[in-house]
Swiss-Prot record:
Source organism: Mus musculus (Mouse)
Compartments (UniProt record): Secreted
GO cellular component terms given for this protein: endoplasmic reticulum; endoplasmic reticulum lumen; extracellular space; nuclear envelope lumen
Residues that carry a glycan: N86, N135, N270, N370, N484, N510, N515
Gene this chain is encoded by: Bche
Tissue: Present in most cells except erythrocytes.
Protein name: Cholinesterase
Entry-linked Pfam families: AChE_tetra, COesterase
Disulfide bonds: C94-C121, C281-C292, C429-C548
Positions of post-translational Phosphoserine modification: S227
Positions annotated as active site in the UniProt record: S227, E354, H467
Entry similarity comment: Belongs to the type-B carboxylesterase/lipase family.
Keywords: Disulfide bond, Glycoprotein, Hydrolase, Phosphoprotein, Secreted, Serine esterase, Signal
Length: 603
């Protein structure tokens, strides 16, 4: 006779048998971790995220390794592989010089590559939600780094939170940087230039051909990037071969019309000749030079890249995009002016203190270890470094506009003014101009002004809301369980992720439903933008309009002035006063118009 205890034991045993026999759901099957692409099968891995999982495929090859005779050439399509490729860890990073300015300092070390350096580096990563979606929106990340550095394997670019929370598929790719990615003999197929951009383009072609197998929608692809990554995104908007490869674009703190982004072909060729000279490859013809440069160890090329430009030049890019007649047929501002741009929706934005990240890398009087309270002389020396080749008159115009015109002069004013000069000229004003031109062509555009300084930022307080430090909120790092962001920052990051994903899915940051602050479309006339911070977002118009008008209209005229310096100086100062008075009147009238319009709307 069975006891009650025996019956209970048998019942428990049967329950365990049933549990073991039950299917655990599709997310736990081998089928979900192995996906067949056009070039072969890849095996991913399951990642725990926020109480759930995502499936990650890390280090999928998308091109032949650009080794030997393929160095300096466009990327070549991949051959099929017979076995299953293990895509379970990040691949090599592309060769690049490491930032050693502040050894051991997290603020700079976080951007250095965290995998082995190799020319065999053309790999991409895919994060997909669980359960595996059908026809999900795809977001493809392009990293920044001035076209000299960067890798997709950095923790700050981890796509798992975005995939898990917003149920989008996230993709990122490595592309060649520095001379190995952008050395150019324009017109020569053995070293045409823009190889790094062609890498990106081939990765986007891979996404088009394969993303459906991962549950993605090839007709809903948003490319997004920061700094040189944003400039890359805007170059794809100007490249007809890239048009079919994506749907929408997000540009964070960068654009291709910025003064650092694209070089004229003559300048690109001259820099290649200079590198050839320093590596002992000065030869009679281009092919001999290319052959010699291909024979060099990549480390030797890296060592000599830094000699291509003067040692005191800051914010200069040794090797970057150029007009090659193929990927890029003209300078970006010309193509924008001619309306030769993809019809699409774009989301663009900048951070409050874009210039500070560059000042600590050599500007006189600046340091990450103090308050960088600089003198007038150091401000002027800083202008000399950031504007080499600009006449004394041109630099005097900048000094007068950003400092003297305000009347107040103190170390803080000089420090903050140089931050504004560098940020306005290189990031903010070009981004606004790109957005304005894009909007003039009847494309929907949206603009943001990022105002939140991360509580975990290792850089000093005076550096403010720095270049690059919105990225951690876009990728959801504050949601991690073992991080010490504030609760407000976690909420803010979720809001940013929702906004970016809404834009990717629907072409509008508000998505299909309204929220507390409706994000207005940016038009070339009103130029409305939204502030992003942990408080309530606000709508404003004409971000830094007087400063950007100075760089767009007044500064070029000053550079053209010749003749007697005293007479010319008097002439530009008089012209400047007339111009600034006009700008102030215009700003006041516009503000009056805006307030009256909003009052009428509220009735």
């Amino acid at each position: 006779m069975q006891t009650q205890h025996t019956k209970v034991t048998q019942t428990h045993f049967l329950l365990w048998i049933l549990l073991l026999c039950m299917p655990f759901g599709k997310s736990h099957t081998e089928e979900d971790f192995i996906i067949t692409t056009k070039t072969g099968r890849v095996r991913g891995l399951s990642m725990p995220v926020l109480g759930g999982t995502v499936t990650a495929f890390l280090g999928i090859p998308y091109a032949q390794p650009p080794l030997g005779s393929l160095r300096f050439k466009k990327p070549q399509p991949l051959n099929k592989w017979p076995d299953i490729h293990n895509a379970t860890q990040y691949a090599n990073s592309c060769y690049q010089n490491i930032d050693q300015a502040f050894p051991g300092f997290q603020g700079s070390e976080m951007w250095n590559p965290n995998t082995n350096l190799s020319e065999d580096c053309l790999y991409l990563n895919v994060w997909i939600p669980v359960p595996k979606p059908k026809n999900a929106t795809v977001m493809v990340w392009i990293y920044g780094g001035g076209f000299q550095t960067g890798t997709s394997s950095l923790p700050v670019y981890d796509g798992k939170f975005l995939a898990r929370v917003e149920r989008v598929i996230v993709v990122s790719m490595n592309y060649r940087v520095g001379a190995l990615g952008f050395l150019a003999f324009p017109g020569n197929p053995d070293a045409p230039g823009n190889m790094g951009l062609f890498d990106q383009q081939l990765a986007l072609q891979w996404v088009q051909r394969n993303i459906a197998a991962f549950g993605g929608n090839p007709k809903s692809i948003t490319i997004f990037g920061e700094s040189a990554g944003a400039a890359s995104v805007s170059l794809h908007l100007l490249c007809p071969q890239s048009y079919p490869l994506f749907t929408r674009a997000i540009l964070e703190s960068g654009s291709s019309n910025a003064p650092w982004a694209v070089k004229h072909p003559e300048e690109a060729r001259n820099r290649t000749l200079t590198l050839a000279k320093f590596t002992g490859c000065s030869k009679e013809n281009e092919m001999e030079m290319i052959k010699c440069l291909r024979s060099k160890d990549p480390q030797e090329i890296l060592r000599n890249e830094r000699f291509v430009l003067p040692s005191d030049s800051i914010l200069s890019i040794n090797f970057g995009p150029t007009v090659d007649g193929d990927f890029l047929t003209d300078m970006p501002h010309t193509l924008l002016q001619l309306g030769k741009v993809k019809k699409a929706q774009i989301l663009v934005g900048v951070n409050k203190d874009e210039g500070t990240a560059f000042l600590v890398y050599g500007a006189p009087g600046f340091s990450k270890d103090n308050d960088s309270l600089i003198t007038r002389k150091e401000f002027q020396e800083g202008l000399n470094m950031y504007f080499p080749g600009v006449s004394r008159l041109g630099k005097e115009a900048v000094l007068f506009y950003y400092v003297d015109w305000l009347g107040e002069q103190s170390p803080e004013v000089y420090r903050d003014a140089l931050d504004d000069v560098i940020g306005d000229y290189n990031i903010i004003c070009p981004a606004l101009e790109f957005t304005k031109k894009f909007a003039e062509l009847e494309n929907n555009a949206f603009f943001y002004f990022f105002e939140h300084r991360s509580s975990k930022l290792p850089w000093p307080e005076w550096m403010g809301v720095m270049h690059g430090y919105e990225i951690e909120f876009v990728f959801g790092l504050p949601l991690g369980r073992r991080v010490n962001y504030t609760r407000a920052e976690e909420i803010f990051s979720r809001s940013i992720m929702k906004t970016w994903a809404n834009f990717a899915k629907y072409g509008h940051p508000n998505g299909t439903q309204g929220n507390s602050t409706m994000w207005p479309v940016f038009t070339s006339t009103e130029q409305k933008y939204l502030t992003l911070n942990t408080e309530k977002s606000k709508i404003y118009s004409k971000l830094r309009a007087p400063q950007c008008q100075f760089w767009r209209l007044f500064f070029p005229k000053v550079l053209e002035m010749t003749g007697d310096i005293d007479e010319t100086e008097q002439e530009w100062k008089a012209g400047f006063h007339r111009w600034s008075n006009y700008m102030m009147d215009w700003q006041n009238q516009f503000n009056d118009y805006t307030s009256k319009k909003e009052s009428c709307t509220a009735l």
